[in-house]
Every structure is written in structure tokens, then in C-alpha cells.
């Protein structure tokens, strides 16, 4: 299985699929799956290509999810090996997307192929959800596929996202959930004027200080067994014209919350509105909800993944919900248990991104064992 994984990973890496350009990656995968009797459905939205490939028609449905798009390479002269050459040196595969996530995508595909070959009459359904819009806008990829599936009431019970979850060694971390993410764009209105005549103006920076102190020190919750406490950070703040003699007429504050399952986006919005009213600030605010929190807890998929990792790596993984958002947040909306498991994340989005060849082989084994536990007849 490892040999096939590496060959496919190299083929994918050699295609410069900077988001959202797929560069033929999904076609390569689709042709392989078609030979094994997978039903293929192309779901393009705008300039994004999505593939929904299934084998079997019964419940439960196990989804392997991944993306073919990669981030830009930056200055190519800084790379030890050309970023789209997929060089293997001393057991390490180099290239943009090697770790995030063409390597683990290849492992997911080969694991599904191998399982179907060995178990052609398996129970349930295996599905691969592959998109070319994860690294950029993430507006026309997995979220659109999920909307399509939900509209026709197609069930998904379990989903394994091949994101690079491991920290120091393969298998040390499984993501069994993610925090929600919501961003506020706040404008506090004042009255512009000359700094020498403050009585004729109203400085929104000054009037907002107490509010901003309350906003940044408020304790939203204490977290829980699976999540750390909700965190708020001011990301951008701007006021003034750049001149030292003009009192600004408006203050702009952009802030983000990474929130756990102890609160909801509505609770957050209402509390911020309450604070603004308390401090009597003339304002306007808009919100962008990037994703709701999701949690697989200690469900069947988590148990299957932990057991598979232990069998293959001889390591007991730590369950973790930290880090940024992933496409798992969209699949979780279907009521599915979602986990993320993949190779080390130490080099993702960096110059000289790379992954261990041995680790990719083991990823494939883990994915195969998950299917065995959940779908073997």
C-alpha cells in the first residue's frame, strides 16, 4: 500500500494546484476510483471543482475528506528542491502540499481502494469528498457539497479529514473537534476635530477604552472536558488620519473569538451588544461566522481511530480540539462524527514543506483499519 500511496502523492504534488485551481488532480483520483466501481459525481461551483465518489449504498456512510488545492510557494529560490518536483531524499517527500494535504489525500484514496478490493461486498457506504477550495475562500468547496447532500437528505455518519494533525511524531494527536470561529467588525462613531479644541470633538478612541477593556477581559466560559475556554483577540484596530493634530472621527476594531461548546454565536453577539449599550457607544457592527464548534467526543469513530493509531504506530494518541478551523466544520453540520488525522504539521505552508514517506504509508494503514472497524461485513 505504501508504494501506491507515494506514487499517487508524487503525481498530485507535481500538479501546481494553487487554490482554487485543481490542475487535474481530481481527475487522476476519479479515474482510479472508477476502475473499482465507485460512482462519481462532479459538483463544480464557480472556479472550484469538487468530487463526490461513493461505493456502496447502505448505512453507515464513512466519508474520507480532503483537498487538492495548496497555498502559494512563495520565493521558489528559497526551496531546497523545486516545490512541484516531489523529490524524495533520505526517506522524505518534499513539495508544496506534501503534508497539507496531498500526501494524506493519497493515503485516503489508496486505503479506500485497498479496502474495496479486499471487501467488495462491505456493509455501508464509503465516500470520498474532495475539493479544490480549502486553502483560500472555502466558499465553493466542501460547504457547497454539504449543502447539496443535505438538500437531497443524503446521510453522512462518520468523516475522517486527512489534515496534518500530528505534532512531534505520527499518531500523537487526533483532532476530535474544533472550536467555532466568529469575527466582529466594529465601528465606533465620534466627532472629528482639531486636537487643540477637544471640546468641539468627540474622540472615539477615548470613549471606547472602558468598553474595550471589558471586551478583552470578559470570561466567556471555563471550557470543558474537550475544549479550552473561549478566547477573544483583537486582530486589527485603526483610527485617525495619520496626522498628529486631528482627533479621529471613527474607531475601527476587528476582533475574533475562538469559542467552545459552552457558548453559541448568538450568546456572543448578544453579550457584545449588551456591553456596547452599557457604555453608550454610537456604533455599527457586523459579524462573520466562519464555523460552529463541533465535537466527536468519544464516539464510535473516535474509538475506531484511536484503536487504528495504536495498532499501527504503537502510540496512544491524545484527543485535541485546539488549532484553527478545517472543512470538518461543514461536514459536522450533517450530524456526522468528525475526526482529523494525518501526518506531522511542522512544515505546512512553509518553504521546504515535506513529509516522511514512512509516515504516509502508516497513515494509509490507519485509514484502512478505520474502514475495517466500521464497515467490514
From Swiss-Prot:
E.C. number(s) listed in UniProt: 3.5.1.18
GO BP annotations listed: diaminopimelate biosynthetic process; L-arginine biosynthetic process; lysine biosynthetic process via diaminopimelate
InterPro entries for the chain: Bact_exopeptidase_dim_dom, DapE_proteobac, Peptidase_M20, Peptidase_M20_dimer, Peptidase_M20A
A GO term for molecular function: acetylornithine deacetylase activity
Catalysed conversion reaction: N-succinyl-(2S,6S)-2,6-diaminopimelate + H2O = (2S,6S)-2,6-diaminopimelate + succinate
Binding locations of Zn(2+) 1: 67, 100, 163
Quaternary structure note: Homodimer.
This protein's name: Succinyl-diaminopimelate desuccinylase
Organismal lineage: Bacteria, Pseudomonadati, Pseudomonadota, Gammaproteobacteria, Pasteurellales
Amino acid at each position: 500500500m505504501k508504494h501506491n500511496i507515494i506514487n499517487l502523492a508524487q503525481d498530485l504534488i507535481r500538479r501546481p494546484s494553487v487554490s482554487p485551481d485543481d490542475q487535474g488532480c481530481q481527475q487522476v483520483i476519479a479515474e482510479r476510483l472508477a476502475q473499482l466501481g465507485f460512482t462519481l459525481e462532479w459538483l463544480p461551483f464557480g472556479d472550484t471543482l469538487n468530487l463526490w465518489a461513493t461505493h456502496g449504498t447502505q448505512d453507515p456512510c464513512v466519508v474520507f475528506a480532503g483537498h487538492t488545492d495548496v497555498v502559494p510557494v512563495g520565493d521558489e529560490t528559497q526551496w531546497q528542491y523545486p516545490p512541484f518536483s516531489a523529490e524524495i531524499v533520505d526517506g522524505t517527500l518534499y513539495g508544496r502540499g506534501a503534508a497539507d494535504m496531498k500526501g494524506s489525500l493519497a493515503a485516503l484514496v489508496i486505503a479506500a481502494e485497498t479496502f474495496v478490493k479486499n471487501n467488495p461486498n462491505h456493509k455501508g457506504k464509503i465516500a470520498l469528498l474532495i475539493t479544490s477550495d480549502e486553502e483560500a475562500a472555502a466558499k465553493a468547496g466542501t460547504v457547497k457539497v454539504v449543502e447539496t447532500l443535505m438538500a437531497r437528505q443524503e446521510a453522512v455518519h462518520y468523516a475522517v479529514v486527512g489534515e496534518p494533525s500530528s505534532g512531534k511524531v505520527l499518531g500523537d494527536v487526533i483532532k476530535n473537534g474544533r472550536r467555532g470561529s466568529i469575527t466582529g467588525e466594529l465601528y465606533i462613531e465620534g466627532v472629528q476635530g482639531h486636537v487643540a479644541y477637544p471640546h468641539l470633538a468627540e474622540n472615539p478612541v477615548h470613549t471606547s477604552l472602558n468598553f474595550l477593556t471589558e471586551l478583552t477581559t470578559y470570561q466567556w466560559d471555563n471550557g470543558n472536558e474537550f475544549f479550552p475556554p473561549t478566547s477573544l483577540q483583537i486582530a486589527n484596530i485603526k483610527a485617525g488620519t495619520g496626522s498628529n493634530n486631528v482627533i479621529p472621527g471613527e474607531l475601527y476594531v476587528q476582533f475574533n473569538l475562538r469559542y467552545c461548546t459552552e457558548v453559541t454565536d448568538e450568546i456572543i453577539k448578544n453579550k457584545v451588544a449588551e456591553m456596547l449599550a452599557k457604555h453608550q457607544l454610537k456604533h455599527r457592527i457586523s459579524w462573520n461566522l466562519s464555523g460552529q464548534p463541533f465535537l466527536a467526543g468519544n464516539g464510535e469513530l473516535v474509538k475506531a481511530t484511536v484503536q487504528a493509531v495504536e495498532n499501527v504506530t504503537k502510540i496512544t494518541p491524545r484527543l485535541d480540539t485546539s488549532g484553527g478551523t478545517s472543512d470538518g466544520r461543514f461536514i459536522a453540520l450533517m450530524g456526522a462524527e468528525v475526526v482529523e488525522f494525518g501526518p506531522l504539521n511542522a512544515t505546512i505552508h512553509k518553504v521546504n514543506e515535506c513529509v516522511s514517506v514512512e509516515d504516509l504509508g502508516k497513515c494509509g494503514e490507519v485509514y484502512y483499519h478505520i474502514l475495517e472497524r466500521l464497515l467490514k461485513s
